[in-house]
Amino acid sequence: MAEEENKKFKVNANDAVNLAAEQSKSTSDKNLPEFGDMPIPDDTANLRKGPNLHDGLLALLPLIGVWRGQGQAAPPGEEEFTFGQQVVFAHDGENRISYDSRTWRMDDDGKPTEIPDRRESGFLRINDDDEIEMILTHSDGMVEILYGSPLNERAWQLESASTMATATGPTNLGPGKRLYGLMPNNDLGWVDERLIDGEMVPWQSAQLSRVVG
């Protein structure tokens, strides 16, 4: 998986920079809402605003932003469905990135419904050896720790090292593997594989466009 996906996300550097500059014309002035009255910096999802990104996070810099789009999910025991998603990667100047994901169901015509779906939140860090760690909590009652590394400057792969479900949490989802990567059009793509009945199965994936940052 890693080698194939690594090739998928590789692009010409100059083309990527030029495309990013053009796309940023509609997103560069947007950011997360600010409280403005806290004694510490507000979170920012825009590298042009707020505190500077910590030097230790430079290998994860392309993720910073708010991303929105659609994906497909096929949970065990359920029919495949389409979902909408918003993902926020933000920072506050410290050596950590906050992560938040909200999803909602789409109807058969591809239109968003008012039915909320899964939520996730957590934090990412990366050390001097380019080892990424992610702490992730799932709204359906699961907590996991993932470790990984960059595949290149535009793609990052993580694998579960520890997964724990609550008493009412999912019992049919085992350890997982998750890949994030910027596609040739600079959309953020991701796919999540899970150990289901002894086999790693892709059960969630999405393609998201930048709306902030």
UniProtKB/Swiss-Prot annotation:
Region annotation (Disordered) ranges: 17-42
Entry-linked InterPro entries: Calycin, Nb(III)_bact/plant, Nitrobindin, THAP4-like_heme-bd
Q: TM segments?
A: none
Residue window of motif GXWXGXG: 65-71
Listed CDD domains: lipocalin_heme-bd-THAP4-like
Write one Pfam family the protein is assigned to: THAP4_heme-bd
Q: Which HAMAP family match?
A: nitrobindin
PANTHER family in the record: PEROXYNITRITE ISOMERASE THAP4 (PTHR15854:SF4), THAP4 PROTEIN (PTHR15854)
**Per the similarity annotation, which family is this?**
Belongs to the nitrobindin family.
Q: What is this protein called?
A: Ferric nitrobindin-like protein
